[in-house]
Curated annotation (Swiss-Prot):
One of its GO terms (molecular function) is N2-acetyl-L-ornithine:2-oxoglutarate 5-aminotransferase activity. May also have succinyldiaminopimelate aminotransferase activity, thus carrying out the corresponding step in lysine biosynthesis. It comes from Prochlorococcus marinus (strain SARG / CCMP1375 / SS120). Binds 1 pyridoxal phosphate per subunit. This is Acetylornithine aminotransferase. The lineage of its organism: Bacteria, Bacillati, Cyanobacteriota, Cyanophyceae, Synechococcales. Pfam families: Aminotran_3. N(2)-acetyl-L-ornithine binds at R152, S296. Keywords: Amino-acid biosynthesis, Aminotransferase, Arginine biosynthesis, Cytoplasm, Pyridoxal phosphate, Transferase. Homodimer.
Length: 419
Protein backbone atom coordinates (compact mmCIF):
# COMPACT_ATOMS: atom_id res chain seq x y z
CA UNK A 1 0.00 0.00 0.00
CA UNK A 2 1.45 3.35 -1.07
CA UNK A 3 0.98 6.40 1.16
CA UNK A 4 -1.04 9.14 -0.46
CA UNK A 5 0.88 12.36 -1.10
CA UNK A 6 0.22 15.05 1.51
CA UNK A 7 -0.91 17.44 -1.21
CA UNK A 8 -4.01 15.30 -1.67
CA UNK A 9 -4.85 15.11 2.01
CA UNK A 10 -7.02 17.74 3.64
CA UNK A 11 -5.92 19.36 6.91
CA UNK A 12 -7.91 20.97 9.66
CA UNK A 13 -6.70 24.34 10.87
CA UNK A 14 -7.25 25.50 14.44
CA UNK A 15 -6.79 28.89 16.05
CA UNK A 16 -3.50 29.03 17.91
CA UNK A 17 -2.11 25.70 16.74
CA UNK A 18 -0.58 24.01 13.74
CA UNK A 19 -2.79 21.88 11.46
CA UNK A 20 -3.65 18.40 12.62
CA UNK A 21 -2.69 15.23 10.77
CA UNK A 22 -3.83 14.74 7.15
CA UNK A 23 -7.26 13.22 6.68
CA UNK A 24 -9.33 11.73 3.89
CA UNK A 25 -12.54 13.23 5.28
CA UNK A 26 -14.38 15.88 3.29
CA UNK A 27 -13.62 19.27 4.81
CA UNK A 28 -17.08 20.10 6.22
CA UNK A 29 -16.22 20.53 9.91
CA UNK A 30 -13.89 22.94 11.68
CA UNK A 31 -12.68 20.23 14.02
CA UNK A 32 -10.85 20.91 17.25
CA UNK A 33 -7.42 19.22 17.68
CA UNK A 34 -8.85 16.67 20.07
CA UNK A 35 -9.10 12.94 19.37
CA UNK A 36 -11.65 11.33 21.71
CA UNK A 37 -11.13 7.61 22.17
CA UNK A 38 -13.21 6.60 25.21
CA UNK A 39 -16.19 7.69 27.27
CA UNK A 40 -17.90 6.75 30.52
CA UNK A 41 -20.82 8.55 32.12
CA UNK A 42 -20.26 12.30 31.78
CA UNK A 43 -16.54 11.91 31.06
CA UNK A 44 -14.44 11.53 27.91
CA UNK A 45 -10.76 10.66 27.38
CA UNK A 46 -8.47 11.66 24.54
CA UNK A 47 -5.67 9.59 23.01
CA UNK A 48 -3.15 10.93 25.54
CA UNK A 49 -5.29 9.80 28.48
CA UNK A 50 -6.46 13.29 29.43
CA UNK A 51 -9.94 13.32 30.98
CA UNK A 52 -12.68 15.82 30.09
CA UNK A 53 -16.04 16.61 31.65
CA UNK A 54 -18.47 16.48 28.74
CA UNK A 55 -21.00 19.34 28.71
CA UNK A 56 -21.78 18.74 25.05
CA UNK A 57 -23.12 15.15 25.06
CA UNK A 58 -22.72 14.79 21.31
CA UNK A 59 -24.75 18.02 20.99
CA UNK A 60 -27.62 16.96 23.25
CA UNK A 61 -27.71 13.36 22.02
CA UNK A 62 -26.09 11.22 24.74
CA UNK A 63 -28.92 11.52 27.25
CA UNK A 64 -27.64 8.64 29.39
CA UNK A 65 -24.01 9.67 29.03
CA UNK A 66 -21.33 7.48 27.49
CA UNK A 67 -21.04 3.68 27.63
CA UNK A 68 -24.21 3.37 29.71
CA UNK A 69 -24.35 -0.18 31.09
CA UNK A 70 -28.07 -0.72 30.53
CA UNK A 71 -28.07 0.69 27.00
CA UNK A 72 -24.89 -1.21 26.08
CA UNK A 73 -26.34 -4.50 27.32
CA UNK A 74 -29.67 -4.08 25.54
CA UNK A 75 -28.08 -3.06 22.24
CA UNK A 76 -25.53 -5.86 22.40
CA UNK A 77 -28.41 -8.31 22.71
CA UNK A 78 -30.28 -6.58 19.89
CA UNK A 79 -27.27 -6.85 17.56
CA UNK A 80 -27.28 -10.60 18.09
CA UNK A 81 -31.02 -10.74 17.40
CA UNK A 82 -31.72 -8.47 14.41
CA UNK A 83 -30.44 -5.08 13.26
CA UNK A 84 -32.45 -4.06 10.25
CA UNK A 85 -35.32 -5.14 8.04
CA UNK A 86 -37.44 -3.15 5.62
CA UNK A 87 -40.53 -1.15 6.50
CA UNK A 88 -42.27 -3.49 4.08
CA UNK A 89 -42.78 -5.62 7.18
CA UNK A 90 -43.98 -5.01 10.72
CA UNK A 91 -41.17 -4.25 13.15
CA UNK A 92 -42.04 -4.99 16.82
CA UNK A 93 -39.34 -2.69 18.23
CA UNK A 94 -40.65 0.16 16.10
CA UNK A 95 -44.23 -0.38 17.23
CA UNK A 96 -43.16 -0.54 20.89
CA UNK A 97 -41.32 2.78 20.69
CA UNK A 98 -44.16 4.41 18.77
CA UNK A 99 -46.63 3.28 21.44
CA UNK A 100 -44.45 4.74 24.20
CA UNK A 101 -44.12 8.06 22.38
CA UNK A 102 -47.85 8.31 21.72
CA UNK A 103 -48.72 7.38 25.31
CA UNK A 104 -46.35 10.03 26.66
CA UNK A 105 -47.24 12.88 24.29
CA UNK A 106 -50.09 14.67 22.55
CA UNK A 107 -49.51 12.70 19.33
CA UNK A 108 -51.53 9.84 17.85
CA UNK A 109 -49.02 8.35 15.40
CA UNK A 110 -45.32 8.36 14.56
CA UNK A 111 -43.08 8.26 11.49
CA UNK A 112 -39.47 7.21 12.10
CA UNK A 113 -36.38 8.38 10.25
CA UNK A 114 -32.68 8.83 11.03
CA UNK A 115 -32.03 12.44 12.05
CA UNK A 116 -33.53 15.79 12.99
CA UNK A 117 -33.16 17.18 9.49
CA UNK A 118 -35.02 14.17 8.08
CA UNK A 119 -37.76 14.57 10.67
CA UNK A 120 -38.18 18.22 9.72
CA UNK A 121 -38.24 17.34 6.03
CA UNK A 122 -41.11 14.97 6.82
CA UNK A 123 -42.90 17.74 8.74
CA UNK A 124 -42.49 20.08 5.77
CA UNK A 125 -44.00 17.52 3.41
CA UNK A 126 -46.84 16.94 5.87
CA UNK A 127 -47.57 20.67 6.00
CA UNK A 128 -47.50 21.06 2.23
CA UNK A 129 -49.93 18.21 1.67
CA UNK A 130 -52.17 19.53 4.46
CA UNK A 131 -52.21 22.94 2.78
CA UNK A 132 -53.16 21.44 -0.55
CA UNK A 133 -55.82 19.03 0.74
CA UNK A 134 -57.34 21.01 3.63
CA UNK A 135 -56.94 24.60 2.41
CA UNK A 136 -56.81 24.17 -1.38
CA UNK A 137 -53.41 25.86 -1.70
CA UNK A 138 -51.44 24.99 -4.84
CA UNK A 139 -48.09 26.33 -3.57
CA UNK A 140 -48.26 26.25 0.24
CA UNK A 141 -46.11 28.53 2.40
CA UNK A 142 -44.71 27.66 5.83
CA UNK A 143 -43.96 30.44 8.31
CA UNK A 144 -40.73 30.02 10.27
CA UNK A 145 -38.91 32.10 12.88
CA UNK A 146 -35.86 34.26 12.38
CA UNK A 147 -32.76 32.85 14.14
CA UNK A 148 -34.22 29.34 13.86
CA UNK A 149 -32.34 26.22 12.81
CA UNK A 150 -34.07 23.19 11.30
CA UNK A 151 -31.31 21.21 9.59
CA UNK A 152 -28.82 21.07 6.71
CA UNK A 153 -30.84 19.23 4.07
CA UNK A 154 -32.20 21.62 1.45
CA UNK A 155 -35.82 22.11 2.54
CA UNK A 156 -34.87 22.17 6.25
CA UNK A 157 -32.10 24.63 5.40
CA UNK A 158 -34.57 26.80 3.51
CA UNK A 159 -36.83 26.78 6.58
CA UNK A 160 -33.92 27.97 8.74
CA UNK A 161 -34.00 31.64 9.68
CA UNK A 162 -30.24 32.23 9.50
CA UNK A 163 -28.76 33.29 6.16
CA UNK A 164 -25.22 32.32 7.21
CA UNK A 165 -26.15 28.65 6.78
CA UNK A 166 -27.83 29.24 3.41
CA UNK A 167 -25.13 31.26 1.66
CA UNK A 168 -23.70 29.39 -1.30
CA UNK A 169 -26.58 26.92 -1.58
CA UNK A 170 -29.06 29.00 -3.52
CA UNK A 171 -31.55 28.63 -5.05
CA UNK A 172 -33.27 27.65 -1.83
CA UNK A 173 -36.51 25.71 -1.73
CA UNK A 174 -39.40 28.15 -2.13
CA UNK A 175 -42.33 28.39 0.24
CA UNK A 176 -40.85 29.78 3.46
CA UNK A 177 -41.39 33.21 5.02
CA UNK A 178 -39.98 34.47 8.32
CA UNK A 179 -41.30 36.24 11.42
CA UNK A 180 -39.57 37.51 14.56
CA UNK A 181 -39.39 35.00 17.41
CA UNK A 182 -41.73 35.77 20.35
CA UNK A 183 -43.40 38.58 18.36
CA UNK A 184 -47.12 38.01 17.74
CA UNK A 185 -47.47 41.21 15.69
CA UNK A 186 -44.75 40.00 13.34
CA UNK A 187 -46.61 36.71 12.78
CA UNK A 188 -49.95 38.43 12.25
CA UNK A 189 -48.58 41.04 9.85
CA UNK A 190 -46.75 38.41 7.81
CA UNK A 191 -49.78 36.11 7.63
CA UNK A 192 -52.21 38.87 6.66
CA UNK A 193 -49.86 40.19 4.00
CA UNK A 194 -49.50 36.73 2.45
CA UNK A 195 -53.23 35.95 2.57
CA UNK A 196 -54.57 39.22 1.13
CA UNK A 197 -56.10 37.62 -1.95
CA UNK A 198 -56.23 33.86 -1.31
CA UNK A 199 -55.17 31.14 1.16
CA UNK A 200 -51.40 30.63 0.98
CA UNK A 201 -50.16 29.56 4.42
CA UNK A 202 -50.18 25.89 5.46
CA UNK A 203 -48.30 25.89 8.78
CA UNK A 204 -46.11 27.61 11.33
CA UNK A 205 -42.85 25.80 12.17
CA UNK A 206 -41.06 26.80 15.36
CA UNK A 207 -38.64 25.61 18.07
CA UNK A 208 -39.89 25.96 21.69
CA UNK A 209 -36.29 26.90 22.49
CA UNK A 210 -34.00 28.08 19.73
CA UNK A 211 -30.82 26.04 20.17
CA UNK A 212 -28.40 27.02 17.39
CA UNK A 213 -29.98 30.47 17.36
CA UNK A 214 -28.65 31.29 20.83
CA UNK A 215 -30.74 29.42 23.44
CA UNK A 216 -33.73 31.74 23.05
CA UNK A 217 -36.63 30.52 25.21
CA UNK A 218 -40.13 30.84 23.84
CA UNK A 219 -42.59 33.11 25.63
CA UNK A 220 -45.71 31.40 26.96
CA UNK A 221 -48.07 34.17 25.83
CA UNK A 222 -46.56 34.02 22.35
CA UNK A 223 -47.09 30.27 22.13
CA UNK A 224 -50.68 30.67 23.36
CA UNK A 225 -51.13 33.18 20.56
CA UNK A 226 -49.68 30.77 17.98
CA UNK A 227 -51.99 27.95 19.03
CA UNK A 228 -55.06 30.19 18.93
CA UNK A 229 -54.03 31.78 15.64
CA UNK A 230 -53.46 28.42 13.94
CA UNK A 231 -56.83 27.14 15.19
CA UNK A 232 -58.67 30.20 13.86
CA UNK A 233 -57.02 30.00 10.45
CA UNK A 234 -56.99 26.20 10.00
CA UNK A 235 -53.21 25.98 9.68
CA UNK A 236 -50.86 23.53 11.37
CA UNK A 237 -48.65 24.37 14.34
CA UNK A 238 -45.42 22.37 14.05
CA UNK A 239 -42.78 22.23 16.79
CA UNK A 240 -39.15 21.34 16.17
CA UNK A 241 -38.20 19.48 19.38
CA UNK A 242 -35.07 17.92 17.91
CA UNK A 243 -32.87 19.48 20.60
CA UNK A 244 -35.43 20.26 23.33
CA UNK A 245 -37.26 16.92 23.35
CA UNK A 246 -36.70 13.77 25.45
CA UNK A 247 -36.23 15.47 28.81
CA UNK A 248 -33.55 17.99 27.90
CA UNK A 249 -35.54 20.88 29.43
CA UNK A 250 -36.59 19.13 32.64
CA UNK A 251 -39.89 18.09 31.08
CA UNK A 252 -40.22 15.32 28.52
CA UNK A 253 -41.29 17.78 25.81
CA UNK A 254 -40.45 21.44 25.47
CA UNK A 255 -44.07 22.30 24.67
CA UNK A 256 -45.09 21.25 28.18
CA UNK A 257 -43.51 24.44 29.55
CA UNK A 258 -46.13 26.46 27.63
CA UNK A 259 -49.18 24.21 28.10
CA UNK A 260 -49.57 24.41 24.34
CA UNK A 261 -49.86 21.31 22.15
CA UNK A 262 -48.63 21.29 18.53
CA UNK A 263 -50.40 19.48 15.71
CA UNK A 264 -47.13 17.68 15.00
CA UNK A 265 -43.59 17.80 16.34
CA UNK A 266 -40.18 16.42 15.47
CA UNK A 267 -37.61 14.54 17.57
CA UNK A 268 -34.06 13.23 17.16
CA UNK A 269 -30.85 13.84 19.14
CA UNK A 270 -31.64 12.66 22.70
CA UNK A 271 -34.13 10.04 21.51
CA UNK A 272 -31.42 7.56 20.53
CA UNK A 273 -28.96 8.17 23.35
CA UNK A 274 -26.16 8.62 20.82
CA UNK A 275 -27.62 6.40 18.08
CA UNK A 276 -29.16 7.69 14.85
CA UNK A 277 -32.92 8.08 15.01
CA UNK A 278 -35.45 10.78 14.25
CA UNK A 279 -39.23 10.94 14.45
CA UNK A 280 -42.24 12.94 13.35
CA UNK A 281 -45.12 12.71 15.84
CA UNK A 282 -48.54 13.67 14.51
CA UNK A 283 -51.98 14.33 15.94
CA UNK A 284 -54.99 12.77 14.24
CA UNK A 285 -56.20 16.09 12.79
CA UNK A 286 -52.89 16.50 10.93
CA UNK A 287 -52.49 12.87 9.85
CA UNK A 288 -52.70 13.50 6.12
CA UNK A 289 -50.08 11.03 4.83
CA UNK A 290 -51.09 7.94 2.88
CA UNK A 291 -49.00 4.88 1.89
CA UNK A 292 -46.33 6.01 -0.57
CA UNK A 293 -46.31 9.66 0.53
CA UNK A 294 -43.11 9.31 2.54
CA UNK A 295 -40.58 6.63 3.44
CA UNK A 296 -37.16 5.85 4.88
CA UNK A 297 -34.93 2.85 4.20
CA UNK A 298 -33.32 2.80 7.64
CA UNK A 299 -35.95 4.74 9.58
CA UNK A 300 -37.49 2.76 12.42
CA UNK A 301 -35.00 -0.12 12.21
CA UNK A 302 -35.02 -2.55 15.16
CA UNK A 303 -31.63 -1.46 16.52
CA UNK A 304 -32.37 2.28 16.57
CA UNK A 305 -35.85 1.77 18.01
CA UNK A 306 -34.52 -0.52 20.74
CA UNK A 307 -32.07 2.24 21.62
CA UNK A 308 -34.87 4.81 21.68
CA UNK A 309 -37.15 2.73 23.88
CA UNK A 310 -34.33 1.93 26.30
CA UNK A 311 -33.43 5.62 26.62
CA UNK A 312 -37.09 6.50 27.12
CA UNK A 313 -37.61 3.94 29.88
CA UNK A 314 -34.34 4.84 31.60
CA UNK A 315 -35.36 8.50 31.70
CA UNK A 316 -38.45 7.37 33.59
CA UNK A 317 -36.85 4.65 35.74
CA UNK A 318 -33.94 6.83 36.88
CA UNK A 319 -36.12 9.88 37.47
CA UNK A 320 -33.95 11.87 35.08
CA UNK A 321 -36.55 14.58 34.50
CA UNK A 322 -36.23 15.60 38.14
CA UNK A 323 -32.45 15.34 37.95
CA UNK A 324 -32.43 17.54 34.85
CA UNK A 325 -34.61 20.11 36.58
CA UNK A 326 -32.47 20.17 39.75
CA UNK A 327 -29.09 20.10 38.04
CA UNK A 328 -30.32 22.68 35.55
CA UNK A 329 -31.23 25.05 38.38
CA UNK A 330 -27.87 24.40 40.03
CA UNK A 331 -26.04 25.16 36.79
CA UNK A 332 -28.13 28.28 36.17
CA UNK A 333 -27.36 29.63 39.65
CA UNK A 334 -23.66 28.97 39.14
CA UNK A 335 -23.66 30.68 35.76
CA UNK A 336 -25.38 33.69 37.28
CA UNK A 337 -22.54 33.94 39.81
CA UNK A 338 -20.09 33.93 36.91
CA UNK A 339 -21.98 36.86 35.40
CA UNK A 340 -21.70 38.70 38.70
CA UNK A 341 -17.96 37.99 38.81
CA UNK A 342 -17.28 38.99 35.20
CA UNK A 343 -19.92 41.64 34.38
CA UNK A 344 -17.76 43.31 31.73
CA UNK A 345 -17.84 40.11 29.64
CA UNK A 346 -21.08 38.30 30.49
CA UNK A 347 -24.71 39.33 30.09
CA UNK A 348 -27.31 36.66 30.92
CA UNK A 349 -28.16 32.98 31.28
CA UNK A 350 -30.48 31.62 28.60
CA UNK A 351 -32.48 28.44 28.19
CA UNK A 352 -33.99 25.97 30.62
CA UNK A 353 -33.16 22.62 32.24
CA UNK A 354 -29.88 21.25 30.88
CA UNK A 355 -30.19 23.26 27.68
CA UNK A 356 -28.45 26.43 28.84
CA UNK A 357 -26.42 29.21 27.30
CA UNK A 358 -24.17 31.87 28.80
CA UNK A 359 -24.51 35.02 26.71
CA UNK A 360 -21.47 37.24 26.15
CA UNK A 361 -21.97 40.99 25.91
CA UNK A 362 -21.95 42.32 22.35
CA UNK A 363 -19.36 44.98 23.16
CA UNK A 364 -16.98 42.41 24.67
CA UNK A 365 -14.14 41.21 22.45
CA UNK A 366 -14.66 37.73 23.89
CA UNK A 367 -16.18 35.01 21.68
CA UNK A 368 -17.69 31.63 22.47
CA UNK A 369 -14.94 29.98 20.42
CA UNK A 370 -12.28 31.44 22.72
CA UNK A 371 -14.01 29.94 25.78
CA UNK A 372 -14.39 26.59 23.99
CA UNK A 373 -10.62 26.53 23.44
CA UNK A 374 -9.77 27.60 26.99
CA UNK A 375 -12.21 25.06 28.42
CA UNK A 376 -10.48 22.22 26.59
CA UNK A 377 -7.25 23.12 28.37
CA UNK A 378 -9.17 23.00 31.67
CA UNK A 379 -10.57 19.54 30.90
CA UNK A 380 -14.08 20.75 30.03
CA UNK A 381 -16.03 20.44 26.78
CA UNK A 382 -18.58 23.14 25.90
CA UNK A 383 -19.75 24.52 22.54
CA UNK A 384 -20.96 27.77 21.07
CA UNK A 385 -24.39 28.79 19.84
CA UNK A 386 -23.22 31.59 17.60
CA UNK A 387 -20.27 33.86 18.37
CA UNK A 388 -21.68 35.25 21.61
CA UNK A 389 -23.30 32.32 23.45
CA UNK A 390 -21.51 29.50 25.30
CA UNK A 391 -23.77 26.45 25.22
CA UNK A 392 -23.94 23.65 27.80
CA UNK A 393 -25.84 20.42 27.09
CA UNK A 394 -24.48 17.79 29.50
CA UNK A 395 -25.92 14.27 29.80
CA UNK A 396 -29.14 14.11 31.81
CA UNK A 397 -27.37 11.87 34.35
CA UNK A 398 -24.94 14.59 35.46
CA UNK A 399 -24.48 14.79 39.23
CA UNK A 400 -24.34 17.69 41.68
CA UNK A 401 -20.59 17.25 42.09
CA UNK A 402 -20.06 17.19 38.32
CA UNK A 403 -22.00 20.45 37.95
CA UNK A 404 -19.69 21.93 40.59
CA UNK A 405 -16.69 20.72 38.57
CA UNK A 406 -18.16 22.20 35.40
CA UNK A 407 -18.57 25.60 37.07
CA UNK A 408 -15.11 25.50 38.64
CA UNK A 409 -13.46 24.76 35.30
CA UNK A 410 -15.53 27.34 33.45
CA UNK A 411 -14.64 29.94 36.07
CA UNK A 412 -10.96 29.10 35.54
CA UNK A 413 -11.36 30.04 31.87
CA UNK A 414 -12.62 33.52 32.75
CA UNK A 415 -10.02 33.94 35.48
CA UNK A 416 -7.28 33.34 32.90
CA UNK A 417 -8.79 36.04 30.69
CA UNK A 418 -8.42 38.55 33.52
CA UNK A 419 -4.78 37.62 34.21
Amino acid sequence: MVDAPHSKCGTFGFVGSSPTAPTFLLDTYKRLPLKIVKGNGCWLWDETGKKYLDAVAGIATCSLGHSDKKLSKVLSQQLRKIQHVSNLYRIPEQEDLAQWLVNQSCADSVFFCNSGAEANEAAIKLARKYGQIKRGIKRPIILSAKSSFHGRTLAALSATGQTKYQKGFEPLVEGFEFFSFNDSNSVQDLYENLEKDEPRVAAILIEPIQGEGGLNLGDQKFFYFLRDYCNKNNILLLFDEVQSGMGRTGKLWGYEHFNVEPDAFTLAKGLGGGHSIGALLVKENASIFEPGDHASTFGGNPFACKAGLTVAKEIQNRNLLENTYCRGNQLREGLQKLINNYPHHLEEVRGIGLMLGLAIKKNSNLTSQKIVELAIKEGLLVIGAGEKVIRMLPPLIITKREIETLLTRLNACFRKLNN
